[in-house]
From Swiss-Prot:
Species this protein is from: Solibacter usitatus (strain Ellin6076)
Subunit structure: Homodimer.
Annotated function: Catalyzes the decarboxylation of four acetate groups of uroporphyrinogen-III to yield coproporphyrinogen-III.
GO molecular function annotation: uroporphyrinogen decarboxylase activity
GO biological process assignments: protoporphyrinogen IX biosynthetic process
Name of this protein: Uroporphyrinogen decarboxylase
Length: 345
């Protein structure tokens, strides 16, 4: 399946083509910092919003209306694919995601299903709602987790600080690890394809926990599966954004796993990151999310410095180095969009 190309400022930048101004959008641009989102969350839980296409579409569209950004990332949850695999997912207040039956043994891996991804059809329905509402104004971005991050959640049973269980399995039974990672890819790839079929015109692969690894372990245990996933997504013809948190120490290795666009967190200067990969992909990022709390003069300076670092080379998409934080002043987010649009190198 290959989709017909769509023209937009954001997609042009993904392909390293010249744009009139720098495209801008934000990870977690739909979230608690917005009053409109908080009003919906007062009545509905995270998973309920994700599984109701009407609500997911409404939340996805809110930042387009409020911020006038250049892309609409679908509102969903990274861990949704683990449910059709047979795992029990819930959200505990103050704890984040909790998996009731984590994967710890060979039997656990054997029991994981890879054939029920049609149960995630509600995400595609939400994308279709958003595509209709936008009527070509901006493209929709779909997303999946990277295999290492998904495996970490599945093994740990939720978020982790040191990833002891994950690394213990990885080091002690490499065969089992590779079976698990292969199954994860076999679920994530068709899920990404279904998002493209529904109308997504780019897919972001989030490797939220990859910073737990060193360079050698990344290359050995994670990169082959990220590469396999990205190659399968790219077969649809849409650009893939590859974003890893805390990966500045092995950014070249991350890039070697693939991606039309490489997302950068705030821990490395974006010009250095781009140079490190010889400008062979577009680059996305990388304002520190906490900079959005700065007074406007300081925020203006930071935004302009970042934009100057990427110069006039086509292929920079302005974003944060991670998601927007819940307490962020919405007026500051709006100000960043205006500053990016006004910037002239």
């Amino acid at each position: 399946m290959r989709v017909a190309p769509m023209t937009s400022r954001f997609l042009d930048a993904c392909r390293r083509r010249p744009t009139d101004v720098r495209p801008v959008w934000f990870m977690r641009q739909a979230g608690r910092y917005m009053k409109q989102y908080r009003q919906i969350r007062e009545k509905h839980g995270i998973l309920e919003i994700c599984k109701r296409p009407d609500l997911a579409a409404t939340v996805t569209l809110q930042p387009i209306e409020v911020l006038d950004v250049d892309a609409a990332i679908i509102f969903a949850d990274l861990l949704l694919p683990i449910e059709p695999m047979g795992l029990k997912l819930k959200y505990e207040k103050g704890e984040g995601p909790v998996i009731g039956n984590p994967v710890r043994t060979s039997d656990d891996v054997d029991s994981l299903s890879t054939t029920n991804t049609d149960e995630l059809g509600y995400v595609g329905e939400a994308i279709q709602h958003v595509v209709r509402a936008l009527a070509g104004k901006v493209p929709v971005v779909g997303f999946v987790g990277a295999p290492f991050t998904m495996a970490s959640y599945m093994i740990e049973g939720g978020a982790s600080r040191n990833f002891v269980r994950t690394k213990k399995l990885m080091y002690s039974d490499e065969t089992l690890w590779r079976r698990l990672m292969g199954k994860i890819v076999d679920v994530l790839a068709p899920f990404a394809h279904s998002q493209v079929a529904a109308g997504a015109r780019a897919i972001q692969v989030f490797d939220s926990w990859v910073g737990a690894l060193g360079s050698d372990d990344y290359v050995r245990f994670a990169a082959p599966y990220s590469r396999a996933l990205i190659e399968r997504i790219r077969s649809t013809g849409v650009p893939v954004i590859h974003f890893g948190t805390g990966a500045s120490g092995f950014f070249r290795e991350l890039h070697a796993a693939g991606g039309d666009v490489m997302g950068v967190d705030w821990r490395i200067n974006i010009d250095q990151a781009w140079m490190d990969i010889s400008y062979r992909s577009a680059i996305q990022g990388n304002l520190d999310p906490v900079a959005l709390f700065a007074p406007l003069p300081e925020l203006r300076t930071k935004v302009q410095e970042l934009l100057k670092r990427t110069g006039t080379r086509p292929g920079h998409i302005f974003n944060l180095g991670h998601g927007i934080l819940p307490e962020t002043p919405v007026e500051n987010v709006k100000a960043v969009v205006e500053l990016v649009r006004e910037f002239r190198p």
